[in-house]
Structure formats: C-alpha cells, structure tokens
C-alpha cells in the first residue's frame, strides 16, 4: 500500500485559538520535512476564533486540511481525522501541546524498522506547566531505551496518554469509543496494542503535554462530574479483557491500578458529595474493581508508593496472615508476600538539644502497623526492656494523599542526657522487638548533612550503619577540657563548610542584650500582627519590638515616625540577625515562608540556636476543615491565639493541640471593631472565591476563566438574586442599599455582575463592616465580625453539592457547619430572598436561636490586644 504522506497528524480543536499557532509551529519545524506530513485540523464546534486560524493555515499549506463539525467531543473529532487520514502512520497531537522537532522523523524511522512487530508506539512524555517547568513520568522506569517492549513482561507501562502513533490500516482502523465520556484515549490504546501485546518506544522523540493548573476539575476528571463515567470505563475494560478463567488480563489489571493510584493521590477517587448510603455503595463498587487486580500486580507497580500498596491491598478485604520471626516480620496472603521487613522507620520532624535535654518529635511508619498493633520503646544505654513511648494517631497517616491511607503513629519525647551514653528505639509486634531506622525531614536539625549536635558540653551524634546506609541511634557524650574545645572547633569548621554565609549568621546569634519580639503579617496585608505591634510598641517593658514589612512604601503610612524606625524589611540582613536573637515571633500566618527570613528548609541549619516562641495570631477564626494546614504535628506553631471556646474545642479535637498551646485573649484585630457605631441602612453580600473558576498566577496575576465562571451555578444564582425584581422592590420599600463585594481574587469578574437597581452596588477594595446592618456570605471568615457585632447573618451557597465534593475549595467540610451557624442556610436565590425579607421585616433582629449562638460565641468583646500582651508577659515572667 502506497500512501501520499509519511504520517498524518490529527489535531482536535475546541476553543484553542491561543494554542494553535505554537502547535503548528512545532509541526512546521519538523526535521523530516513538512511536505511529507499531512496535518488534519479537526474543529469540533469551536465558538472562538479557532476555526478562522485553522482555515488560514489550510489555505497557506496544501498538506494542511481543515475538518469542521458540530461539537461532538474529542473522540468524534479524532475519529473524523482517522477517517480522513492519508498518511502511512497516524499521530495524535492536542492543540495545546507540542512535540520535539525530531519527533516525526524518529517515530516514522522506528515504525518502518519494526512494522510487523507492533501496531502502536509511544515516545517520551513531558508535563509542562504555566511556569514552563517540565517533568517526566514514572513509566520511564520501565521504558528506558528505544526498543519494542513485550507488554506481558512489562504490564506496568500503562500507556494512558496520547503521545502515541499508530499504523494507518484504512478500513481496518480502530476508532475511539464515543460512548466513553473519559478515558477514551486509554481504551483506544489498549485496543491498538493488545492484539500483538507489544508496544514500541522511541526515547529520542518528545511530547510536551501542557498541564493546566486546576485542570482536574475543569476537564471533568473530578468525581462530582464523572464518578459513574470512570466506573463505566472500568467496567468496559474488565468486560473486554476478561480471560476464559474469569480473571482479568494482567495488562488491563495494571491499567486499572494505574487509574486507582493517580486518583487516590489527586483526591479524585471518592464521590464525597454522595449521602452516606450512596457513598458506601460507591466504595463497594470501587472495591469490586480493585479486587480484580492481583496482589502481585499491586506489589510490582513502579507507579504506586509502597505504603499505598498496603492501602489497595486492604481495600480488597482479602484474608491475610502476619508472621513474626526473630529478625523479620511479614504480612502475606495465601499466595503473595505483602510486607517483609526487619525494622520500623521513625521519621523525625523536630529535633532540638536544649538544657541537657534532647527533644525528639516525629512519627512511626511501619508497613506492618497497617495490619497489626504496634508499640514503640525508648532504650537508653544497655537497658534491655526500654521505656514505652506514647503513640497517638499521626496526621501523616494521610500519606501523600488527602485520604487516610495508612496507620502512622505520632510521638514526642524529651530525653535527659545526664548519665547516658546511647539512645535508640525499638518497635514491638506480638511481643517481639525489632530495631528502627531513622529518617530526618528538612526541618529537623539532624540529617545527612548534620550528624552531630552540640549544646554547651553535650554532644549528640547519629549512629550510621555503613552496610545498610541507615541511621540507627544516637551516641551521647559529655565533653570537657581539651575534648570540648576540639569538638567545638570541629563543629564550627563543619558549619563553615556547609554554609559559608550562614556561618557568620550563626556567629551573630545569642548576642541579644534584651528581649526581641518580631511581628509579621503577610505581604500586602494589615492584620493581627500590625494591631498588636501598635498596642505593644509604646509599653516600657525592656522589650525591643520590630514589625516586618516587604516594602516600606507600601505600609509606612500606617505607622508614626517613631514606629517607622522599627520597621524591618523581610529577609534583610537586619531581619535575619533579629530573628536569630528573637524570643517571640508573633505572626498572623504560620508558614515559615511568611515569618522566617531563612525560609522553611534552611531554617534547620540554625535550629540549635533558635529560642523564639512562635505565637500564631491567626488571620481569622478557623471554621473550615483544613487539617493538612493546621494540624499541630505539621506546623511550627508553639502557641495559638483563640477568641472563642469553639476554637479551643476545635483545635483540640481536629488538629491535635493541647490546653497549654492556647492563649485565650482573642485576636488583636477584634479590639479595633467599634461595637458602638450605629449601622447604616446597608447590607453587605460577600461570598468567597472558588478554585475551579479561576486559573493560576501568571506574571503575578490570576488567569481568568470567563466561560467557566459565567456558566457556573455560583455566578448564575448570585446574578439571579442581584437582578431579582423582588430584591429591588424590597430595598425600595425599606429604603435599604445592598453592596456586593467579591473576594479580592474574584474582583476582575465584577463587570459580569449587572443590576438595574440604583440601590445595589458592586464594590471593589475594602469595606468597613461596622457600617452594615447585616451580612450575606458563604464561607468567609468575615462573618465572625458580624457575630462580634451581634448583627444578623445569612448563608448562601448555590453550589453546595460541589463544595461537598471538593470541587470549589481546598476544603470540602466545615468544622463549624453552616447548618449550625449564626443564620439561615440557603442554596437558591428564592430561598435567600425569602430569608432576607423575614429579617428585614423583623427589623434585622435574628431568631432567638441565632442570637444565643452569637452572644455565647466570643470569650471577650473588647481589649483583646491588652489581654494578649498580659498573657505573653505573664509567661515571660514565669
């Protein structure tokens, strides 16, 4: 068979006008020679300028053809291209992606050389994000060299993306299954490769896949949109590749597992928006499909983390046994060994040597603990029995996932060094003891680059097993005389070699003549640290206070001339020296990237010198469930300022804080709210933003997504409310105004909110909350200002089901559920209008239930900044 072209490149296009030119440029620049290629631009009903651009290229080049059709989806678009293809081979390229200049030449040459062996080949895939960074894929642990690979021997290739090329078999060409709403590419690849069960790989060619931030939700891969769709793909895969003995073909098993794995890690496996009964049924359906995957397929996958292997094995609910030997322990099913280990692993997150005591904090991770109870023992010197170490469930049990995948155990211990020479830990399983190995995170003072810590005359050194290349214990020495002087010189030489500039910062530490307190808000933000600094600054108590700023010009007008002398630029030399000598860091944000001039990772280099207490002032009352951000085990927080009994209970129950961590003074900003000011006849409507309706930061600006925004339930229902004749009439009747205030991230969408009423205004910039009679919101923490003012609140969440699914926010549940909040909870414009009318007719007096919740919420109302100062100085005096 003779073909007029070496290859046909099929480019499906839907509203891709910004990407078409770069895509075509990569094809025009192919080393094989552009005239030897056919380019099929398939316009799938675009509504932007895509078709005109494509037509221009088709008119300019005779080997570029435009196919236009009504919008039918990417599968139908590719099928149209396949039917029209005149090249010997067919290559697929999405409009927002590109390929390397040599790709077509390398691909066609390889296919020509192996034509009878394979029907499909792949080539190297690189993910590229908005910042231009590229990164590879785990399948290249298998596909290492250009060759033909037997899929029965390499089941975990799991080719799932369209960096592929197939033979053009004309009438015998396979088409994409248009009944699949997703994973149509995976099924097409399986169909084209399973007849020969071989796949070609061309390492020299590259496909650059443009990964949009937030694309998981935008493209419909989120369970909210597609849970039944991806289960249908699982069903089709299992029906098509079922073997005569009833088992699923192992190549199909590996592809199933691959999909389970990336969905688990991306938190898009479970349909959290289902009610309890529906959710349990959904989990059972997932268990059925993971049950089709053999244990050894799970255990041999290069894509799956070993601890996630345990998760999937337990998900299958197969019977298992645990064996405990004198030196090893194992977990196994009837046919497969799941776990085979000789020791547990301790992950140390915080290590600190102070006042003759070694503080160690971290978590125990051991594969066997997913299946069996485990204990941890501290062994000092030759103590054979050891001392039990208290274990609590670790926040890191959500391992590389938002789902609790494993049973890890948190520990914290303070070990007096006096009289001891060695420290080690053992785990106990079924009465048998096993040793441990140690891993140190970037925030721990110990690690591969720091095997010794010295404080005063105490030296603690890590034990390193050279054969196993692991850390196994700590050796303790009390130094004196010449040994002390020599070791001190060695330590200084080590720090000098490790970080030349940092060494001189270390030498400047510990030189303070008085107490130093640092106050931090975030760039561009005036928050609790500012208000507390203003309160504390004039107090004569021998404490030097400094407020940290990113840019003097941005904030200097907030300060008096005298105060400006104590403004310090973030990450400046002065900031670093003050930080190393500070006794308190008061910050509205608890990330080290906000309050530390050294950032998070380099901070460990100075950890043995730091004495500051990190006081987290908060930037609002935490009412959304955000364990990965706020758990004590994950954070650098020493003490936390709380304003309510709710917060104390919440931080204890959900985030692992203890009574000693709380400062119950209330946030300093609250003291600036004027509770005596009479409100104007105004209502504020201030919703939060949605992560699925706006793009990433590009050049310090969020990328807008107008199509998604305008079609969203969030926008449509808010607009219905704002344009409602009933709302206009209500405002006229009671002589009221309503200010709609988008979240700052969403302010660029303000132009889309239109109203015919002169009483409704769309605001930009700040608003003074004391001037409003009431607030309408969804999840905004500003609601607590109105609780503080004893003014009514209404909740309005038109996309509540999407919120529960995890589509709209970084959280999907509330620590303080809206149904138990401070006002009626509504989801439609009609419900909101009805509740608003009731409140207005009742002269803005909330129902008794909501009044009581407001009155009982705050610990204090007034003087929070002074109370905080008293709490901080009381502890200092103690």
Kindly give the residue locations of the regions a language model identified.
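Active-site and donor-binding regions of nucleotide-sugar-utilizing enzymes
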Residues: 360, 396-399, 424, 428, ...
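Conserved catalytic-core segment of nucleotide-activated headgroup transferases in glycan assembly
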Residues: 247, 524-533, 537-540, 668-752, ...
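Catalytic binding pocket for nucleotide-activated donors in carbohydrate/polymer assembly enzymes
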Residues: 659, 752-756, 781-857
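Short aromatic/hydrophobic "clamp" motif used to bind/position activated sugar donors
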Residues: 90
């Amino acid at each position: 068979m003779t073909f007029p072209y070496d290859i046909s490149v099929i480019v499906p296009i839907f509203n891709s006008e910004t990407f078409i030119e770069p895509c075509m440029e990569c094809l025009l620049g192919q080393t094989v020679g552009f005239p030897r290629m056919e380019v099929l631009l398939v316009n799938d009903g675009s509504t932007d300028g895509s078709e005109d651009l494509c037509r221009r290229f088709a008119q300019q080049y005779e080997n570029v053809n435009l196919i236009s059709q009504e919008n039918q989806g990417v599968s139908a678009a590719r099928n149209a291209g396949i039917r029209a293809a005149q090249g010997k081979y067919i290559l697929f390229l999405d409009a927002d992606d590109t390929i390397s200049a040599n790709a077509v030449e390398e691909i066609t040459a390889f296919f020509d050389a192996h034509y009878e062996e394979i029907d499909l080949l792949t080539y190297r895939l690189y993910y590229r994000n908005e910042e231009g960074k590229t990164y590879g894929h785990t399948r290249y642990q298998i596909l290492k060299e250009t060759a033909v690979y037997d899929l029965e021997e390499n089941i975990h290739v799991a080719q799932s993306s369209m960096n592929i090329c197939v033979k053009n078999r004309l009438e015998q060409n396979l088409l994409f299954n248009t009944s699949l709403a997703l994973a149509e590419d995976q099924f097409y690849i399986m169909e084209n490769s399973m007849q020969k069960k071989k796949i070609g790989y061309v390492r020299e060619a590259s496909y650059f896949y443009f990964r949009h931030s937030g694309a998981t939700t935008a493209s419909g891969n989120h369970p909210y949109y597609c849970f039944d769709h991806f289960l249908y793909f699982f069903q089709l895969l299992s029906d098509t590749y079922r073997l005569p003995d009833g088992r699923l073909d192992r190549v199909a098993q590996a592809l199933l597992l691959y999909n389970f794995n990336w969905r688990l890690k991306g938190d898009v496996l479970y349909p959290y928006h289902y009610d309890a009964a529906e959710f349990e049924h959904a989990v059972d359906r997932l268990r059925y499909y993971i049950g089709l995957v053999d244990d050894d397929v799970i255990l041999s996958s290069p894509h799956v983390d070993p601890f996630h292997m345990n998760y999937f094995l337990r998900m299958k609910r197969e019977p298992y046994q645990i064996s405990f030997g004198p030196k090893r322990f194992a977990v196994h099913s009837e046919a497969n060994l799941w776990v085979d280990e000789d020791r547990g692993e301790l992950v140390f997150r915080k290590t600190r040597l102070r006042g003759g005591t070694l503080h160690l904090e971290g978590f125990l991770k051991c594969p066997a603990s997913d299946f069996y109870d485990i204990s941890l023992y501290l062994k000092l010197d030759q103590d054979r029995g050891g001392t039990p170490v208290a274990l609590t469930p670790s926040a890191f049990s959500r391992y590389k996932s938002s789902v609790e995948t494993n049973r890890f155990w948190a520990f914290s211990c303070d070990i007096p060094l006096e009289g001891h020479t060695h420290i080690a830990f053992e785990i106990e399983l079924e009465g048998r003891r096993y040793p441990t190995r140690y891993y140190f995170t970037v925030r721990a003072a110990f690690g591969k680059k720091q095997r010794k810590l010295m404080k005063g005359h105490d030296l603690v050194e890590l034990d390193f097993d050279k054969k196993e290349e692991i850390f196994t214990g700590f050796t303790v020495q009390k130094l004196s005389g010449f040994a002390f002087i020599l070791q001190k010189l060695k330590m200084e030489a080590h720090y000098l070699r490790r970080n030349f500039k940092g060494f001189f910062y270390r030498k400047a530490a510990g030189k303070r003549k008085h107490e130093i307190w640092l106050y931090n808000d975030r760039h561009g933000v005036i928050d609790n640290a500012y208000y507390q600094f203003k309160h504390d600054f004039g107090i004569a108590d021998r404490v030097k206070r400094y407020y940290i700023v990113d840019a003097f010009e941005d904030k200097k007008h907030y300060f008096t001339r005298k105060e400006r002398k104590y403004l310090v630029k973030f990450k400046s030399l002065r900031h670093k020296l003050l930080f190393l000598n500070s006794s308190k860091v008061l910050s509205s944000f608890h990330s080290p990237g906000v309050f530390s001039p050294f950032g998070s990772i380099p901070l460990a280099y100075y950890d043995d010198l730091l004495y500051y207490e990190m006081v987290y002032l908060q930037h609002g009352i935490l009412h959304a469930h955000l364990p990965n951000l706020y758990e004590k085990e994950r954070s650098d927080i020493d003490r936390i300022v709380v304003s309510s009994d709710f917060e104390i209970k919440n931080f204890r129950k959900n985030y692992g804080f203890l009574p000693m961590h709380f400062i119950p003074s209330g946030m300093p900003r609250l003291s600036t709210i004027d509770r005596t000011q009479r409100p104007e006849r105004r209502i504020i409507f201030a919703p939060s933003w949605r992560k699925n309706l706006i793009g990433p930061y590009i050049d310090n600006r969020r990328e807008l997504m107008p199509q998604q925004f305008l079609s969203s339930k969030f926008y449509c229902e808010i607009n219905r409310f704002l344009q409602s004749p009933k709302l206009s009439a209500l405002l006229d009747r009671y002589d009221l105004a309503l200010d709609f205030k988008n979240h700052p991230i969403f302010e660029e969408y303000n132009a889309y909110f239109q109203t015919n009423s002169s009483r409704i205004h769309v605001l930009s910039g700040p608003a003074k909350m004391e001037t409003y009679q009431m607030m309408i919101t969804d999840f905004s923490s500003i609601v607590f200002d109105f609780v503080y003012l004893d003014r009514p609140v209404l909740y309005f969440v038109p996309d509540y089901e999407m919120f529960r699914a995890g589509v709209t926010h970084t959280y999907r549940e509330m620590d303080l559920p809206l149904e138990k909040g401070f006002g009626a909870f509504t989801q439609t414009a009609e419900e909101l209008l009805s509740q608003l009318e009731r409140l207005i007719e009742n002269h803005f007096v909330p129902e008794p239930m909501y009044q009581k919740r407001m009155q009982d919420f705050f610990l204090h109302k007034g003087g929070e900044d002074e109370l905080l100062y008293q709490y901080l100085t009381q502890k200092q005096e103690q």
